[in-house]
Swiss-Prot record:
Catalysed reaction, written as an equation: 3-dehydroquinate = 3-dehydroshikimate + H2O
Its EC number(s): 4.2.1.10
Protein family per UniProt: Belongs to the type-I 3-dehydroquinase family.
Highest taxon above the source species: Bacteria
Protein name in UniProt: 3-dehydroquinate dehydratase
GO MF entries: 3-dehydroquinate dehydratase activity
Task performed by this protein: Involved in the third step of the chorismate pathway, which leads to the biosynthesis of aromatic amino acids. Catalyzes the cis-dehydration of 3-dehydroquinate (DHQ) and introduces the first double bond of the aromatic ring to yield 3-dehydroshikimate.
Organism the protein comes from: Lactococcus lactis subsp. lactis (strain IL1403)
Sorted UniProt keywords: Amino-acid biosynthesis, Aromatic amino acid biosynthesis, Lyase, Schiff base
Length: 226
């Protein structure tokens, strides 16, 4: 059995697209991520009951990735919180919360920490204070802590792998990390070494640069983790 869980994103751009999605295509995914930021706020709330009904047999991670962290939606703090609160009424397995961008929303949702993937995304670099950021996020006691960063050199990828390993050994196996882009692909399949417990794989369109397909990810992890 693989140790690393595979998360497969769904990125819908209009309400009608949901009907065309085949649930069976996602049957081997451990977790289905609804990347809702390709819709408007109103469309998200309209689609939610249909989405959760369609994927009622799946573990769902709800993600509203904002422009500031590399996503496609720009909303106020109030609207961000409103959407997450509404989504929580459908009892998703997990919700992504952008800790450094939407701290007030995190504070308002602390009762749901057991469902939270507390996240930080940096599409420009691997910040020098990444370890401190990870520790700060870990101290909030959420289910998982996730970071995705952009390497500029090979050593940036190796640094991320080492930081992830150090954090896992010190604080436990609830960290998710990845270096984006082609340069960072190794980080997506090395969880068995670093302790990163989830990886994100694409079915069709990737949700982040450097993402590997579901079929390829399954094949590689089956070799590395058996």
């Amino acid at each position: 059995m693989r140790k690393t869980k595979i998360v497969v994103p769904i990125m819908l751009t209009e309400l009608a697209e949901l009907e065309k999605v085949s649930v069976s295509d996602y049957r081997t995914a451990d977790i289905v991520e609804w990347r809702a930021d390709f819709l408007s706020a109103d469309e998200i709330l309209e689609m939610a009951p249909k989405f959760f009904e369609k994927f009622k047999e799946s573990k769902i991670l709800f993600t509203l990735r904002t422009v500031r962290e590399g996503g496609n939606i720009q909303v106020s703090e109030k609207k961000y919180l409103q959407i997450l609160k509404e989504i929580l009424t459908y009892n998703p397995a997990y919700i992504d919360v952008e800790f450094f961008t939407h701290g007030p929303s995190f504070a308002a949702l602390k009762d749901f920490r057991d469902k939270m993937v507390l996240s930080y995304h940096n599409f420009d670099e691997v910040p020098s204070d990444l370890t401190n950021r990870l520790i700060k996020m870990h101290e909030e006691g959420t289910a998982f802590v996730k970071v995705a960063v952009m390497p500029e050199r090979e050593c940036d990828v190796l640094d991320l792998l080492q930081i992830t390993r150090d954090m896992t050994l010190e604080y436990g196996d609830h960290f998710i990390s990845m270096a984006m882009g082609d340069l960072g692909r190794l980080s997506r399949i090395s969880g068995y070494l670093t302790g990163s417990c989830w990886t994100f794989a694409s079915l069709e369109n990737s949700s982040a640069p450097g993402q590997i397909s579901l079929k390829e990810t399954e094949y590689i992890l089956d070799i590395l983790e058996k």
